[in-house]
UniProtKB/Swiss-Prot annotation:
Catalyzes the conversion of S-adenosyl-L-methionine (SAM) to carboxy-S-adenosyl-L-methionine (Cx-SAM). Transmembrane segments: none annotated. NCBIfam families: carboxy-S-adenosyl-L-methionine synthase CmoA, PRK15451.1. Keywords: S-adenosyl-L-methionine, Transferase. This is Carboxy-S-adenosyl-L-methionine synthase. The keyword Transferase applies. The keyword Protein biosynthesis does not apply. Belongs to the class I-like SAM-binding methyltransferase superfamily. Cx-SAM synthase family.
């Protein structure tokens, strides 16, 4: 059961850096719905993309799976036999709850839930890979290597879904979308104190890139096609395609 996010409703003397601990895991569904505009749309559309791209006898990777929302959306939309989903997260609290969520919904496609570092996971025989608000928590210097590995592990015709919070090269646009995002959080019941404290905790661990930077990395990794397919304020999702025809 998810609880309402009140983690930052009272002043915290020493904020520290953000961690995906048990307290965050407990309120995560409420937190992300009230904090990330368009999150539900992205999750449901990841399922639609899975219906198009997941092939029989292949694997799907959900890297940074949190509580398994994207994994469940993919599994609901797989139309082929002998597929497998591998869901990975490095937070023990998230993984524990993810396993419970996955087990609560029965489906023919097996899901392997792995507690581990996504940088250490071998990607192979993949028809689809999901990075749903995950890359932004890696050190910027490590992001290209992960995308390179994903491209190498994708089968021809495979797809990567990359959802992120964006920064903007145009400062005026960046300021507008930043303020609209804060209006979104206020409209969802967050106070100025809650918004400020959470932002302070995240600023050293969530480092955002522009859409242009993401596309440049994807091209460097080898992806022949990539485009922004969803955006709401300063949040959005890209799809990157590996050339070729799925076997």
């Amino acid at each position: 059961m998810s609880h309402r996010d009140t983690l930052f409703s009272a002043p915290i003397a020493r904020l520290g850096d953000w961690t995906f601990d048990e307290r965050v895991a407990e309120v995560f569904p409420d937190m992300i719905q009230r904090s990330v505009p368009g999150y539900s749309n992205i999750i449901s559309m990841i399922g639609m993309l899975a219906e198009r791209f997941v092939q029989p006898n292949t694997q799907v990777y959900d890297l940074g799976c949190s509580l398994g929302a994207a994994t469940l959306s993919v599994r609901r939309n797989i139309r082929h036999e002998h597929c497998r989903i591998i869901a990975v997260d490095n937070s023990p609290a998230m993984i524990e709850r993810c396993r419970r969520h996955i087990d609560a919904y029965k489906a023919p496609t097996p899901v392997e839930v792995v507690e581990g570092d996504i940088r250490d996971i071998t990607i192979e025989n993949a028809s689809m890979v999901v990075l749903n608000f995950t890359l932004q928590f890696l050190e910027p210097a490590e992001r290209q290597a992960l995308l390179d590995k994903i491209y190498q592990g994708l089968n021809p015709g495979g797809a990567l879904v990359l959802s992120e919070k964006f920064s903007f090269e145009d400062a005026k646009v960046g300021e507008l979308l930043f303020n609209m995002h804060h209006d979104f959080k206020r409209a969802n019941g967050y106070s100025e104190l809650e918004i400020s404290q959470k932002r302070s905790m995240l600023e050293n661990v969530m480092l955002t890139d522009s859409v242009e930077t993401h596309k440049s990395r994807l091209r460097k990794a080898g992806f022949e096609h990539s485009e922004l397919w969803f955006q709401c304020f300063n949040f959005g999702s890209l799809v990157a395609l590996k050339a070729g025809v799925a076997a």
